Each structure stands twice: as structure tokens, then as C-alpha cells.
Design a protein with these regions (language model features):
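Acyl-donor (CoA/ACP) binding surface of acyl/acetyltransferases
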Residues: 1-22, 27-29, 67-181
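An amphipathic alpha-helix signature
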Residues: 17-24, 44, 48, 52
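Short helix-loop boundary/capping segments at the starts of domains
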Residues: 29-32, 56
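Conserved GNAT-fold acetyl-CoA-binding loop/helix
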Residues: 31-49
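A general structural signal for well-ordered secondary-structure junctions
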Residues: 32-33, 60, 144
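Short, polar/charged, Gly/Pro-enriched helix-capping and turn/loop motifs at alpha-helix termini
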Residues: 37, 61-62, 121
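Juxtamembrane/interface motifs at transmembrane-helix termini
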Residues: 42-45, 54-55, 92-93
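A short helix-loop-beta-strand connector motif used in the catalytic cores of GNAT acetyltransferases and
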Residues: 51-63, 72
Length: 181
């Protein structure tokens, strides 16, 4: 099982049990939780159960490291090796990196990992309709909208798909700029 992947100036380190409390604190912060489908407070016990469930080859959760700092979390989960698909996700906790090229570096590294290392053919993203930043970000990456499901708060969960070839086309356009820095 791969524990570290570096590309585009970021390093993705597989989430380990000693880091789950940091991730829980990030995840419980309203600046992060308000964009998540599950918005309830996460207890330490809930976090331990979650980690036990996702610590396997069907889920890769990575701490994002940029310039020797842990700045967020990215993942591919629910990998279906039969259909060659998985669901991607990202959150950058450190505000100073939000409106920079760093989220692109992270998602390019994750998608390269998924398409090149895991040999997936497509990625899915579920995004809450009030998360305009994530919607625009995913559209720029080449994701295409599929459908939506409304939750009890009247916020819709939107589904987007990214095919491998569409991703590489978009990535190559952006990567030329990223690699010059």
C-alpha cells in the first residue's frame, strides 16, 4: 500500500492514527464543516471508528504537506477496482493557501496518483450546492455535472464526474504554469 506520493511541489502522506485528532479538529472547525455533507460535531470516538473503517486499500486519505507544513487533507475513497472509479475529496485548512495555486497542486497530485498509480478511469466528486468555490474548482478541472440530491437542509448534493482523458487535457494546460514556479 502506498504511503507517500509527491508531485507538483506537494507531498501526500497517508493518514495515520497519530494524525486523526488533528484532522478531527480541522474537520470540526465551522470553516470546514459547513461545506461537508456530515456537519455534526465529531467526537474522538467517532473519529477512531471512522479511521478503522477507512484505513484500507479501498480508501486513500492523505495529509497534505506543502513547504514542510501540514495544511489539509485530500482523499480518494470508495475505490471500485471493478469499475475503475473512486470518489475524490479535498480540504485545505490553512487559509493562506486557499486562493493560491496550492489546491490545484494538491488535486493534480491526487488525480495523478489515482489515474497513474491506481489505474482508475474516472473520479466522482459530491459537492454541496452552497460550496461555490469547490464547484468552480471542479469545473475548471474538467468535471462534468451529473445530478443532485437535496438533503434535509435544502442544500443539494451535486455529483460531478471526471474522465481520465478529460483530466489529463485540463491538467496539462495548468501544469505548464505550475511547473514554471
Amino acid at each position: 500500500m502506498i504511503t507517500e506520493f509527491s508531485k507538483y511541489g506537494v507531498t501526500l502522506r497517508r493518514l495515520t492514527e497519530d494524525k486523526i485528532e488533528m484532522v478531527r479538529n480541522w474537520r470540526n472547525d465551522p470553516k470546514i464543516s459547513r461545506f461537508m455533507d456530515f456537519r455534526d460535531f465529531i467526537t474522538p470516538e467517532m473519529q477512531k471508528k471512522w479511521f478503522a473503517k477507512i484505513d484500507n486499500e479501498n480508501n486513500y486519505y492523505f495529509i497534505v504537506n506543502y513547504k514542510d507544513r501540514e495544511i489539509g487533507l485530500t482523499n480518494v475513497r470508495d475505490i471500485d477496482y471493478g469499475n475503475l472509479s473512486g470518489e475524490g475529496g479535498i480540504f485545505i485548512y490553512e487559509d493562506e493557501f486557499l486562493n493560491t495555486d496550492v489546491p490545484y497542486r494538491v488535486i493534480f497530485a491526487l488525480n495523478d496518483f489515482c489515474f497513474d498509480e491506481l489505474k482508475l478511469e474516472k473520479m466522482v466528486a459530491h459537492i454541496m450546492s452552497d460550496n461555490k468555490r469547490a464547484i468552480n474548482f471542479n469545473l475548471l478541472l474538467g468535471y462534468k455535472a451529473e445530478n443532485s440530491v437535496q438533503n434535509e437542509d435544502t442544500v443539494k448534493k451535486l455529483t460531478y464526474w471526471l474522465e481520465k482523458n478529460d483530466y489529463f487535457r485540463q491538467r496539462d494546460r495548468f501544469a505548464r504554469v505550475l511547473l514554471k514556479r
